[in-house]
From Swiss-Prot:
Protein name: Cytochrome b
Chain residues that bind a ubiquinone: H201
Something else known: Heme 1 (or BL or b562) is low-potential and absorbs at about 562 nm, and heme 2 (or BH or b566) is high-potential and absorbs at about 566 nm.
Classification via SUPFAM superfamilies: a domain/subunit of cytochrome bc1 complex (Ubiquinol-cytochrome c reductase), Transmembrane di-heme cytochromes
Source species of the chain: Thomomys bulbivorus (Camas pocket gopher)
Amino acid sequence: MKIMRKSHPLFKIVNHAFIDLPTPPNISGWWNFGSLLGMCLILQISTGLFLAMHYTSDTLTAFSSVAHICRDVNYGWLIRYMHANGASLFFICLYMHIGRGIYYGSYLYKETWNIGILLLFLSMATAFVGYVLPWGQMSFWRPTVITNLLSAIPYIGQDLVEWIWGGFSVDKATLSRFFAFHFILPFIITALATVHLLFLHETGSNNPLGIPSDCAKIPFHPYYSTKDFLGALLLIMFFMTLVLYFPDKLGDPDNYMPANPLNTPPHIKPEWYFLFAYAILRSIPNKLGGVVALVLSILVLAFLPYLHTSNQRSLMFRPLSQSLFWTLVADLLLLTWIGGQPVESPFIIIGQVASILYFTIILILMPLAGLIENKMMKW
């Protein structure tokens, strides 16, 4: 008699995806972040659902409804802080996942990589509209400033901004539609993540050496399911420490004041996980140029498969490309810091240099390093 997980139509899908999945025998802990992202997504959807039960998307009551959740709802404060800090955790895992993909050449699986870029854009959109919902000072001023950048688009810019706002300013219509977007987008992300997995399982996982491992693959369970469980346990420990001891560490104090259109905060900035893109946006004095640079800061990832010049897939044995990769990581950290600073000297020039370096490394230096390494290896 056949085992049910191998014969039942529904269990068979789960079996092929998570139990008997042929997996390279040498993948490291850097491959854990995919499953951790799945865990973060489940956490965000479940906590968000409970918050949506008590939240009201009206400009008059939104701020007080969040206060009501924290004060009067049983464990509401915990659900709220888990959801708020869960977004930070999600983006930490996301950036680690992308970094691993770049380092080990996983971007050569073009379909999987492009779906991943689309998932990144959708995740950023979800986080952006979600930050508006508490209707604090930063919740109001941030979308006002960021969405107003779309007015730089020729011909349709101003109409597009007013269409997004639902009026001539960020108001009740904006809050209602942003709440609707914030509710539906995670489910679209879940569907796309399934497609992402589907494409990945068509090709099989990459490995640190970047070489085919079809002849030596092992089943995912119990080897990697145990490893993923350990990763999840460590992440939960870090996450709960953050939520219970430092819940407001990654937030903005201005958001504890109700939204006031007549009082502008001294320094409007996005959440920490968008600061690198915000710094690139600010580094260009022209409004339209800044918007284009902002989009390209993420879209540039789509060029990576076409800029790969090395005969080796992974950076494991490519010291020149390795040094460029870690320079890129340092540059992104510098941009994140700059994005949180006021627009004044010397931060302006540092941001401009770091922005130029970001695009130069990805578009010019890394392909060049691949060619040099090929020459050094006499390939």
